[in-house]
């Protein structure tokens, strides 16, 4: 933790299946150049029914000397869509990558704090990163299909993890490897709302698909290894309105079975598809986290209201 951080610790209580999360914003001394009024936000109070999937406590991230994320604490409920919004450079993508340790790949990155997946610390030195990234999948901003067939894009992950060879799919479907693979490909593409468009050309190169189809293929590829959490970093930012609408419909459908955390610059998109929204502002600070309707209709923080209404950012 940096000496520049001066916050009261977050509290977490649970009563009758309802979890309460409280956070306190940084003191005025922590935000050089901003007025006291800008940083004098009251603590946010967020309640949700059901179970917590991810729990983040006092998370800080530095890239060299740059303090990119400051003392973030929040809990993410399972089987829901959590949107992360904020201006460019506010730390929302950095935060997203912390949830499956993608920042570990950046040599200059230093991470302090705790992230738990169903009570298990993912930053434990003995954590299995391959297994972690199977449980918490990632879909990136730009579609990145493998230069292979559509079929191979889907089956690559399960084969790499040994699911097919170890007979996991045999137990699920009672068929040999070839039939298991076919079932897996069809199931994953149907989940990603792509099957009807590509079922007659599974052996075609995936690079021949449109941008929107490629992104849904990447989502299907993520689903093929049966994750519990799906992280999405602006998955529709490079797509046209029709393709974007399909991605949004897909995200809402996926939240019935998966926990989805999505970064978006599109506030209208966040309002349409998410159950709860976290607002990050310049300096890597989580300013407010609440039900999406509350964030967009009656935010507690004046800074969040100014951002939502376009007064800055």
From Swiss-Prot:
Could you say which enzyme class this protein belongs to? translocase
InterPro entries named in the record: AAA+_ATPase (IPR003593), ABC_transporter-like_ATP-bd (IPR003439), ABC_transporter-like_CS (IPR017871), P-loop_NTPase (IPR027417), PstB-like (IPR005670)
**All residue ranges annotated as the ABC transporter domain in the record:** 54-308
Per the UniProt entry, the Enzyme Commission number(s) are 7.3.2.1
Question: Which cysteine-cysteine pairs are annotated as disulfide bonds in the entry?
Answer: none
- Keyword annotations: ATP-binding, Cell membrane, Membrane, Nucleotide-binding, Phosphate transport, Translocase, Transport
Protein's recorded name: Phosphate import ATP-binding protein PstB 2
Originating species = Haloarcula marismortui (strain ATCC 43049 / DSM 3752 / JCM 8966 / VKM B-1809)
| GN (gene name) | pstB2
């Amino acid at each position: 933790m940096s000496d520049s951080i001066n916050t009261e610790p977050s509290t977490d209580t649970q009563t009758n299946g309802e979890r309460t999360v409280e956070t306190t914003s940084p003191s005025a001394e922590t935000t050089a150049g901003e007025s006291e009024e800008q940083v004098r936000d009251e603590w946010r109070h967020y309640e949700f029914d059901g179970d917590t999937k991810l729990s983040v406590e006092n998370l800080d991230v530095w890239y060299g000397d740059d303090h990119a994320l400051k003392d973030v604490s929040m809990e993410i409920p399972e089987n829901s869509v959590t949107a992360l919004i904020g201006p460019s450079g506010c730390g929302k993508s950095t935060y997203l990558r912390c949830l499956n340790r993608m920042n570990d790949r950046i040599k200059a990155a230093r991470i302090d704090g705790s992230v738990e997946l169903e009570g298990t610390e993912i930053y434990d030195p003995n954590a299995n990163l391959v297994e972690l990234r199977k449980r918490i999948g990632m879909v990136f901003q730009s579609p990145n299909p493998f230069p292979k067939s559509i079929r191979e894009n889907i089956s690559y992950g399960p084969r790499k993890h040994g699911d097919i060879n170890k007979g996991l799919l045999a137990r699920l479907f009672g068929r040999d490897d070839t039939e298991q693979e076919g079932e897996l490909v069809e199931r994953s593409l149907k989940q990603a709302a792509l099957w009807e468009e590509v079922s007659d050309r599974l052996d075609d190169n995936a690079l021949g698909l449109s941008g929107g189809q490629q992104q849904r293929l990447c989502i299907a590829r993520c689903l093929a290894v049966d994750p519990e959490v799906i992280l999405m970093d602006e998955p529709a930012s490079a797509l046209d309105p029709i393709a974007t609408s399909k991605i949004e419909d897909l995200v809402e459908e996926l939240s019935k079975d998966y926990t989805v955390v999505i970064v978006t610059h599109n506030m209208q998109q966040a309002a349409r598809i998410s159950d709860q929204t976290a607002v990050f502002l310049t300096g890597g600070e989580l300013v407010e986290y609440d039900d999406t309707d509350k964030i967009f209709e009656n935010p507690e923080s004046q800074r969040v209201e100014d951002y939502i209404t376009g007064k800055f950012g």
